[in-house]
Amino acid sequence: MEKWWFNSMLSNEKLEYRCGLSKSTDSPDPIENTSGSEDRVINNTDKNINNWSQIKSSSYSNVDHLFGIRDIRNFISDDTFLVRDRNGVSYFIYFDIENQIFEIDNDQSFLSELESFFYSYRNSSYLNNVNSSYLNNVSKSNHPHYDRYMYDTKYSWNKHINSCINNYILSGSNNYSDSYIYSYICGQSRTRSEHGSSSKQTSTNGSDLKSSNVLYVAQKYRHLWIQCENCYGLNYKKNLKSKINICEQCGYHLKMSSSDRIELSIDPGTWDPVDEDMVSLDPIEFHSGEEPYKERIDFYQRKTGLTEAVQTGTGQLNGIPVAIGVMDFQFMGGSMGSVVGEKITRLIEYATNEFLPLILVCSSGGARMQEGSLSLMQMAKISSALYDYQSNKKLFYVSILTSPTTGGVTASFGMLGDIIIAEPNSYIAFAGKRVIEQTLKKTVPEGSQAAEYLFHKGLFDPIVPRNTLKGVLSELFQLHAFFPLNPKKIK
């Protein structure tokens, strides 16, 4: 059995017991151990690992140290923290009594069943009697590892939760079937000895249980977590914007709204949108069997707060005046219809007349089928305006390809930049993988439409991470003789 050792990484000020934590939850860095009088077990890693091997015969687990805190009443009400094992695998643990939530990330089946224990705990009289229980019981316990902050009234519940976490981690959850986790947490008659080879056992309803739990958790807790498309790790929603939508687990660049991208690139207080009131009038009166086109437009307008799939305007980037258009994939997949094409064309013409550098951020599924040939016309219209801007006026255009950039956008202005920048791991293609495979009856190699692969084929210039993009753009503009209005704004 592989042994594990926990280190607290992200915590809040309440988690100061034993570990001597000196950082707050605002810091993403690992918390250093600064206490000189730590608990003997915490201080000695080797001894601690030996204790893990004796967990079956011990009534006390080292996960108690994880929950050992100075004020459990504050902690248990609403708290989120992260623990990491010696191999670097991270686990989120989230408590919220008011909303009846107890979360442990990495196994949805484990999480779902563990919640039921938390609900019964929350509905008990613990919160009403916690102070008196503590005073009555703190002197009664003679347990050698008794923690005076873990009250006897619910110590058995706490011990059960700790035991669940212990066995979940020690089992190396990927090596054990869902039926094992399910039966253990639910207190079934089946014991661990009966699962000596549980990694090889299967359950008739195991896959159904896992699928239903994944769907249940994804729906119920989506207001708290965003799941990474690459590593499937969970990112705390409140912290994601400050991380510019980059996964904390693997560094994958998640999708961003157009408003967030504008906020990232444009100096505060300088954004001036144009053509905000331009909306589609359903030019070909397209109607599908499911939902009229006009109703779909109205739905996405309410959902995103935008009038169309692109925001255009002017602003300053490190003091340099620029014209910028940012597509939003959340609005009908960023599809390019007549309004999107018209707004981008007008922006290019304005930049041409004002001699401004131009940025277009692409995130689109291609031309909008609900507008037929009118949407296809936008490709030629935008390309024509760019020809005048680049070839006749000799101005500077930067296109930024984000995930996904496909279809008519790739075939027109997306690939016409003087400098073409791609975000890491972006999906960039003309036709999607499924369309190619269904049309040509051939398998598309995995990763052949990823930014890194296409970069080595010379399809675009640099791959620039989000956190350095603004600085790179600023240097490119100055290299092409576009300078800040106020030199002090150069970063």
From Swiss-Prot:
A zinc finger (C4-type) spans 228-250. It holds the Pfam family Carboxyl_trans. Residues 224-491 form the CoA carboxyltransferase N-terminal domain. Binds 1 zinc ion per subunit. It is found in: Plastid, Chloroplast stroma. Transmembrane segments: none annotated. This is Acetyl-coenzyme A carboxylase carboxyl transferase subunit beta, chloroplastic. PROSITE patterns: COA_CT_NTER. Keywords: ATP-binding, Chloroplast, Fatty acid biosynthesis, Fatty acid metabolism, Lipid biosynthesis, Lipid metabolism, Metal-binding, Nucleotide-binding, Plastid, Transferase, Zinc, Zinc-finger. Component of the acetyl coenzyme A carboxylase (ACC) complex. Biotin carboxylase (BC) catalyzes the carboxylation of biotin on its carrier protein (BCCP) and then the CO(2) group is transferred by the transcarboxylase to acetyl-CoA to form malonyl-CoA. Zn(2+) binds at C228, C231, C247, C250. The gene is accD.
